[in-house]
Amino acid sequence: MIWTVRDAQVALAPVFEQYGVSRAVLFGSIAQGTATQESDIDLLVDSHLRGMKFVGLMEAIRQVTERPVDVFDVTHIERGSPLDWEIHATGLTIFENAI
């Protein structure tokens, strides 16, 4: 299966809600519409999860999507880094919890 932005939104919203994620941004090949069957899922999340709780979120995403995932918390991204630029250039918000 080649994942789309909509696929990611639908599949991951329950996971984000369960783990208390306040915002999730999809970036990389899926966000750009250039994904292949081998593409991983690249996500930036705004959460208060640390340590094993963050690992639990990553594992839940991996289980739901059955794909390799790269998940970064907003606190992991160095401002102005190449990754920060990529997220801002290609990122699409796929989840926002308005609590």
Please name every model-derived segment:
Residues 1-23, 32-37, 48-99:
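Catalytic core of pol beta-like nucleotidyltransferases
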